[in-house]
Amino acid sequence: MTDKSDRTDWVALMRAIRDHRDEAAFAELFQHFAPKVKGFLMKSGSVASQAEECAQDVMATVWQKAHLFDPSRASVATWIFTIARNRRIDGLRKDRQPEPEDLFWGPDSEPDQADVYEMQQENARLGRAIARLPEAQRALIERAFFGDLTHRELAAETGLPLGTIKSRIRLALDRLRQHMS
């Protein structure tokens, strides 16, 4: 005695779904494969509710992507179970992703007055150190960091070679580091 699934032409059903959006063919395919996909997912570690949801998602994908099924490359069962396996892997990857930390949304708290004072003192020291740089270095530092110009833009603006711009900025940063320490 043969089972009905042995006599069913799954490829013909897939063609009917693909070519005619045949809902009856899809219902027959769904009745046969959805429980098997759910069982496959449960055997691979999913809880029943997740397996049910994933099986529904897999069968919806079968309906939506029926045009991608190629009987010369795989059987209907292989194609459907490959979709199920890939969804299972996607679910595992999603579960492994760390949750972002709870972010506080709202106005920032007021900075500590000691921190504000310290930052003001540091800014004043930096201003004095920049003022002590040679004019050529100071001008480049100000335009690069406060004027938001790239080294290439500075070279084009001043007519100096790019290497000279980089050297002067590096030397200026070295001097600032010495003055600030």
Curated annotation (Swiss-Prot):
Coiled coil: none annotated. Residues 129-178 are annotated as: Sigma-70 factor domain-4. Residues 151-170 bind DNA. InterPro entries: RNA_pol_sigma-70-like, RNA_pol_sigma-70_dom, RNA_pol_sigma70_r2, RNA_pol_sigma70_r4, RNA_pol_sigma_r2, RNA_pol_sigma_r3/r4-like, WH-like_DNA-bd_sf. Gene3D superfamilies: 1.10.1740.10, Winged helix-like DNA-binding domain superfamily/Winged helix DNA-binding domain (1.10.10.10). One of its GO terms (molecular function) is DNA binding. Residues 29-96 are annotated as: Sigma-70 factor domain-2. GO terms for biological process: DNA-templated transcription initiation. PANTHER family: RNA POLYMERASE ECF-TYPE SIGMA FACTO (PTHR43133), RNA POLYMERASE SIGMA FACTOR SIGZ (PTHR43133:SF62). Interacts transiently with the RNA polymerase catalytic core formed by RpoA, RpoB, RpoC and RpoZ (2 alpha, 1 beta, 1 beta' and 1 omega subunit) to form the RNA polymerase holoenzyme that can initiate transcription. Forms a 1:1 complex (via sigma-70 factor domain 4) with anti-sigma factor ChrR; this inhibits the interaction of RpoE with the RNA polymerase catalytic core. The sigma-70 factor domain-2 mediates sequence-specific interaction with the -10 element in promoter DNA, and plays an important role in melting the double-stranded DNA and the formation of the transcription bubble. The sigma-70 factor domain-2 mediates interaction with the RNA polymerase subunits RpoB and RpoC. The sigma-70 factor domain-4 contains a helix-turn-helix (H-T-H) motif that mediates interaction with the -35 element in promoter DNA. The domain also mediates interaction with the RNA polymerase subunit RpoA. Interactions between Sigma-70 factor domain-4 and anti-sigma factors prevents interaction of sigma factors with the RNA polymerase catalytic core. This is ECF RNA polymerase sigma factor RpoE. It comes from Cereibacter sphaeroides (strain ATCC 17023 / DSM 158 / JCM 6121 / CCUG 31486 / LMG 2827 / NBRC 12203 / NCIMB 8253 / ATH 2.4.1.) (Rhodobacter sphaeroides). The lineage of its organism: Bacteria, Pseudomonadati, Pseudomonadota, Alphaproteobacteria, Rhodobacterales. The gene is rpoE.
